[in-house]
C-alpha cells in the first residue's frame, strides 16, 4: 500500500497538479464557481415552485409566474454569466483588462449562439410584433459554447495586445477610456469572427459540440457497466481539476 501511495505522490500527483493548474482549465473552474451565488438563489426559487404539499400549487397560482422569474434570470441564462466569469479569470491570468474581456466574451457568445426570432404579426396579450431573442439558448444547454467563446475571445484580445495592434491614446486620457479604445480592434475581430461563423456560414458551435458529445452522452445515460465506470471516472477527474463533477 505504501508503495502505491509513493507512486501516486511522486508520479501521478505532479501530473494531475499540472493539469489542474493549467491556465484555461483554472479559468473555467473559477469562472463557473464565481456564479455559484446566482445558482443557489435561483435554485431556491425552483424549490418554492415545487413544494410537494397538497394544495400548494393552487395557493401560489396567482404569483407562480413571478416566482419563476428569478430562476429564469439566474440559472436560466447561466451561459451569459459563465462566459463573462471565465473571460474575466482568463484575462486576469494574462494581465489583460478583465472587464473589457468579459464584455467581449459575452458579445461573442451571444452572436455565436442566439439567432433573433422575427415575429411579423403579434398576438395581443401573448407576444408583440418585432425581433425577439429566445433565452432557451442561454441556459446550461449552451454552456460548452459559452466556455469556448470566452476562451477564444480572450485569446484574440491577448494576440492583439501582444502584437501591439491597438489604438493608443495620449497619456492624459483616463485609463478607462484608453482601455476601451485599445480593445476596439480586438472587438471588431471577435464580433466579425463569430458573426461569420454563425450567421453567414450557419455553423452553431453549441450544437456542434453537443453532436460531438452525443455518443458519450449515450454511454453515460445507459445502464451498462462501461457507462457507470466512465461516469465515476469523469466525476473523480473533474474533482481533481477542482470542478464538482456531478454539478
Predicted regions and their residues:
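Signature of multi-pass transmembrane helix bundles
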Residues: 2-47, 54-244
Amino acid at each position: 500500500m505504501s508503495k502505491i501511495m509513493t507512486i501516486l505522490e511522486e508520479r501521478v500527483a505532479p501530473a494531475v497538479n499540472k493539469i489542474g493548474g493549467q491556465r484555461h482549465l483554472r479559468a473555467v473552474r473559477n469562472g463557473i464557481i464565481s456564479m455559484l451565488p446566482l445558482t443557489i438563489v435561483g435554485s431556491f426559487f425552483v424549490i418554492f415552485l415545487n413544494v410537494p404539499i397538497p394544495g400548494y400549487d393552487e395557493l401560489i397560482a396567482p404569483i407562480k409566474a413571478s416566482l419563476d422569474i428569478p430562476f429564469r434570470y439566474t440559472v436560466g441564462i447561466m451561459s451569459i454569466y459563465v462566459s463573462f466569469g471565465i473571460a474575466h479569470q482568463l484575462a486576469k491570468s494574462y494581465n489583460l483588462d478583465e472587464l473589457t474581456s468579459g464584455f467581449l466574451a459575452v458579445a461573442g457568445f451571444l452572436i455565436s449562439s442566439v439567432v433573433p426570432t422575427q415575429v411579423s404579426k403579434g398576438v395581443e396579450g401573448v407576444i408583440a410584433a418585432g425581433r425577439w431573442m429566445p433565452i432557451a439558448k442561454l441556459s446550461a444547454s449552451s454552456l460548452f459554447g459559452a466556455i469556448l467563446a470566452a476562451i477564444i475571445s480572450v485569446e484574440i484580445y491577448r494576440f492583439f495586445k501582444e502584437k501591439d495592434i491597438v489604438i493608443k491614446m495620449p497619456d492624459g486620457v483616463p485609463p478607462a477610456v484608453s482601455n476601451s479604445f485599445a480593445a476596439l480592434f480586438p472587438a471588431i475581430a471577435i464580433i466579425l469572427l463569430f458573426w461569420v461563423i454563425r450567421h453567414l456560414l450557419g455553423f452553431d458551435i453549441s450544437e456542434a459540440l453537443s453532436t460531438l458529445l452525443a455518443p458519450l452522452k449515450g454511454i453515460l445515460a445507459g445502464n451498462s457497466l462501461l457507462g457507470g465506470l466512465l461516469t465515476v471516472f469523469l466525476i473523480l477527474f473533474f474533482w481533481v481539476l477542482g470542478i464538482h463533477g456531478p454539478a
